[in-house]
Amino acid sequence: EMYLSAVDTLAQHGYEQYEISNFARPGFASRHNLKYWHMDEYAGFGPGAHSDLGGVRFAYVRDIDRYIAGQLLLSESETEETLARDFEYVMLSLRTAEGIDRAYFERTYRQRFAPLDGLFRQYETAGLAQPTEKGWRLTPQGFLVSNSIIVALEDALAAQKLQRQTAAASGDYRIV
C-alpha cells in the first residue's frame, strides 16, 4: 500500500518511474542504472569490481592485497555459453517501465516470444502487466510481485528450451 501510494505521490509531483524502485524527473533517469537494465557492456576497475565486456562477465578479487599483487586477479567469470542471457533480458527488462521488447527478444535470442504471451495475458487480467507498443511491461501492482512473475517466466523459457532441444534431438529443426 505504501509503495503504490509513493508511486502516485511521485507521479503527481512530476516524477516518472523508470525502474522498479527508481523515479526521476523527465530526462534525468540514471544512465548508470539503465546501463545494467538494458544489458549494455560495462567495465569495472579495482578490487571487487565487475565487468561485462565482449560476451564475458567477470569480477576482480575483493582482497586489495591480492589485487595489488596482480596474481589471480579474477575471482569469477562467465561466458556467453554459461550465461542465460534470454532470461536475464526478461528479468532486467521487467524491472524497467519500458518492459520487454518482443521483436528484440526474438531477434537477439533466436526464439519465439509467443509462449510467454499466454502468461502475460493472465497477468494483464490480474492487473499486473499491460501491453506496450513493443511488448509487455509490469504495472505498479506487478512490480510488487515481480519476483513471482519472473520465476514463472523463467520456467516458461526453460520449458521452451527443453522442447527445442527435444525436437532437435529427434531431427525436427522447425522453430519451436
Give the role of each language-model region.
Residues 84-91, 117, 143, 147:
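Non-catalytic, well-ordered alpha-helical scaffold segments
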Residues 6-10, 123, 149:
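Hydrophobic alpha-helical packing residues
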Residues 110-125:
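Short amphipathic alpha-helical interaction segments
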Residues 135-139:
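Minor-groove-contacting beta-hairpin "wing" of winged helix-turn-helix DNA-binding domains
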Residues 141-176:
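Short, amphipathic alpha-helical interaction segments positioned at domain boundaries
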Residues 1-111, 161, 171-176:
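C-terminal scaffold of the Radical SAM
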Residues 124-134:
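A short, conserved structural fragment
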